[in-house]
Amino acid sequence: MKVIFLEDVKGKGKKGEIKEVPTGYAQNFLIKKNLAKEATSQTIGELKGKQKAEEKAQAEILAEAKETKKALEDEKTVVSFSEKVGPDGRTFGSITAKKISEELKKQFDITVDKRHIELDHPIRAIGLIEVPVKLHKEVKAEIKLRIDQA
């Protein structure tokens, strides 16, 4: 019996795959547990339509990520911070991914999720710093930060 997998099933198939499996296994396990459905011409057509829509959505997300990268890597896009500095040259407060994301939105109206900003640890130094950002699995960019003494 041909089935379309609705979920990943270890050793049998991945979500969206169309495979031939034993009839008993399909009816008594896969279909009952909503892990798969019978592959009819109608369900195959629905699957193809969903896959096309998903590909289109992924292409839009990729295009948006490339647009954001272009905006971030513009020479004028330098996020400015003004922090109090102690005698050792380190800031009193630290600059986190959340702060960077908020300032980017406030200063340049560019939205970047704080989870995409790749900071190993919060920034406590002053000066010019470049921070890597992973906008998409294929698109990486750098945010330029200028941290001045208040």
Curated annotation (Swiss-Prot):
Keywords: Ribonucleoprotein, Ribosomal protein, RNA-binding, rRNA-binding. GO terms for molecular function: rRNA binding; structural constituent of ribosome. Disulfide bonds: none annotated. One of its GO terms (cellular component) is ribosome. PROSITE patterns: RIBOSOMAL_L9. GO terms for biological process: translation. InterPro entries: Ribosomal_bL9, Ribosomal_bL9/RNase_H1_N, Ribosomal_bL9_bac/chp, Ribosomal_bL9_C, Ribosomal_bL9_C_sf, Ribosomal_bL9_N, Ribosomal_bL9_N_sf. Belongs to the bacterial ribosomal protein bL9 family. Binds to the 23S rRNA. This is Large ribosomal subunit protein bL9. It comes from Streptococcus uberis (strain ATCC BAA-854 / 0140J).
